[in-house]
Design a protein with these regions (language model features):
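Helix-loop-beta segment of a Rossmann-like dinucleotide-binding subdomain
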Residues: 94-122, 156, 164
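A conserved short coil-to-beta-strand element within the FAD-binding core of flavoproteins
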Residues: 139-156
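Dinucleotide-binding Rossmann-like beta1-alpha1 core, especially the glycine-rich loop
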Residues: 8-97
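Conserved acidic E/D residue at the C-terminus of a beta-strand in Rossmann-like folds
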Residues: 1-5
């Protein structure tokens, strides 16, 4: 159920890496998706003036360093730093290093963790088209009533037109 009278907010949205997993589950073609939603790939989130003015922090999507059975990476890094062998801790984050150099690539091994920056209204339209291609029927209207079973589950929804839609799964995407 969707109403043409209720618009969507067309703003840029930042996602997190789990979005990528959702798209894999839905078998969404990444190139098509990025084109349709005017999206870009992001390797982390940048926080400007994080602690002090002019001091930025990038929260990279991914892991820093490689741990092993003996200990976590941070232990090796701290020991190396104490001996003068280690670079900055952030230098061991592939996502952060790629972000700082404005680089990205789909690698066969050591896949970079990433997310997207997208136009929310274009994404809603894209998902609608995908769903309709899979047989989902879009019903124009406004929900004015929600009827529940004795256990509290949704039994059906009533539209402004009087149409009653029953179902087993209802998802509110407002």
């Amino acid at each position: 159920v969707e109403s043409d009278d209720i618009g969507t907010v067309g703003v840029g949205e930042a996602t997190i890496p789990t979005f990528f997993a959702l798209h894999q589950l839905l078998k969404i073609n990444e190139a098509e998706f990025l084109s349709e939603v005017q999206g870009t790939i992001k390797l982390g989130i940048s926080f400007e003036n994080w602690k002090n003015k002019g001091e930025d922090y990038i929260h990279a999507f991914g892991y820093t360093g490689k741990s092993c059975w003996a200990a976590g990476f941070q232990h090796f890094w701290l020991k190396g730093k104490g001996l003068g062998f280690s670079e900055e801790y952030s230098c061991y984050s592939p996502e952060l290093m790629a972000a700082r150099q404005h680089k990205f690539g789909h690698l066969k091994q050591n896949q970079l963790n990433y997310a997207y920056h997208i136009d929310a209204s274009l994404y809603a339209k894209y998902l609608r088209r995908l769903a309709e291609r899979q047989g989902v029927v879009r019903q124009e209207g406004k929900v004015v009533e929600v009827n529940q079973t004795a256990s509290g589950n949704i039994q059906d929804v009533v539209l402004e037109s009087g149409l009653v839609i029953d179902g087993q799964l209802f998802i509110d995407c407002s």
